């Protein structure tokens, strides 16, 4: 059963400006500890695109849940990692998922300066009603 679909587009220059003003604060606000470890290992040239993709991904996932960031789910409730082939893998904290049956989240990310886009689809093998 389809639970929801979400998409988000982020202007990378917008994230660059935020990073210039608040270099560490912004990353710590939206990234989980696992994501921060990846972020630190990147060269600074990749920081804005990395953050833009994570921001867009988390917005898209929250929209697919039908709630939006700050409306029942927060940035740190969602972790975006990559498998060995680079495919994005989404983990959602148990604080949020305890309310739901088992589900799968499919996420696609793309960036082509100056924009990045995220598209999320959430499905379940059970009938679920959100809201």
Swiss-Prot record:
Pfam families, alphabetized: ACPS
InterPro entries hit by this protein: 4-PPantetheinyl_Trfase_dom (IPR008278), 4-PPantetheinyl_Trfase_dom_sf (IPR037143), ACPS (IPR002582), Ppantetheine-prot_Trfase_dom (IPR004568)
Location in or out of the cell: Cytoplasm
Catalyzed reaction equations: apo-[ACP] + CoA = holo-[ACP] + adenosine 3',5'-bisphosphate + H(+)
Binding site for Mg(2+): 8, 59
GO biological process, one term: fatty acid biosynthetic process
Superkingdom, natural source: Bacteria
Nucleotidyltransferase as UniProt keyword: no
E.C. number: 2.7.8.7
GO CC, alphabetical: cytoplasm
Keywords for this protein: Cytoplasm, Fatty acid biosynthesis, Fatty acid metabolism, Lipid biosynthesis, Lipid metabolism, Magnesium, Metal-binding, Transferase
Signal peptide annotation: none
Membership in a protein family: Belongs to the P-Pant transferase superfamily. AcpS family.
HAMAP family reported for this sequence: AcpS
Purpose: Transfers the 4'-phosphopantetheine moiety from coenzyme A to a Ser of acyl-carrier-protein.
Protein name: Holo-[acyl-carrier-protein] synthase
Organism: Rickettsia massiliae (strain Mtu5)
Lineage: Bacteria, Pseudomonadati, Pseudomonadota, Alphaproteobacteria, Rickettsiales
